[in-house]
Amino acid sequence: MGLRREGRRLHVGFVAPSRDRVDEFWHAGIAGGFRDAGAPGERPDYKPDYYGAFLLDPDGNSIEAVHHGSLRTGGGIDHLWLRTADLAASRRFYGVIAPSAGLHIRDLAPEHVQVVGSSGSFSVVPGPPTSGLHMAFPAATDAAVDEFHRAATGAGYRDDGPPGERPAYHPGYYGAFVLDPDGNSVELVNHNRPANR
């Protein structure tokens, strides 16, 4: 697998521990020359206690700091939104890889598919497609990685790196890569570290 350019047309919402930190994020971004995409404030259309602020990075990606009552505690990303040229094709792709990747699919609305894993979720919505993205999901076994690759390539999705160990990343790193319908690289990886054994 080769190096990729930076992602485009992506939305990432980062966890902020307080409303004050949301405000600090936005003010620092504006002072740093980032474009405003939504000043700090409540957004009750999302959730009653949702408070967020939005900036655009130099590539046009939407970057948000968000604080609300049901924030994830095990990571820095609250949510991710991908855009796709063909929502039905993306739904089929994630449906194919879901069993081996430990994911399940929820249709939240006709134009909104949510992919849910054990430690978070992301949304897929129609629009000019996200590009240049590499997204990896954890696997508990090398066999799950093999099955992920076999299922995806067997369904006609393009190989982006066959199952195998990649010691350049770290000892025990076992991953496989396929391309989603929009050409983004999706990986399943078993880190084979003591916690995984």
Model segments located where?
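Long, continuous compositionally biased terminal/linker segments
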Residues: 1-3, 8-10, 113-155
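Intrinsic disorder/low-complexity detector
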Residues: 5, 73-75, 197
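Residues that flank catalytic or metal-binding motifs in active/ligand-binding sites
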Residues: 8-10, 51, 76, 131, ...
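Vicinal oxygen chelate
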Residues: 12-58, 85-88, 136-182
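Short, contiguous alpha-helical
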Residues: 56-63, 179-195
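Surface-exposed beta-loop interaction hotspot
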Residues: 57, 66-85
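Core segments of cupin and vicinal oxygen chelate
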Residues: 81-121
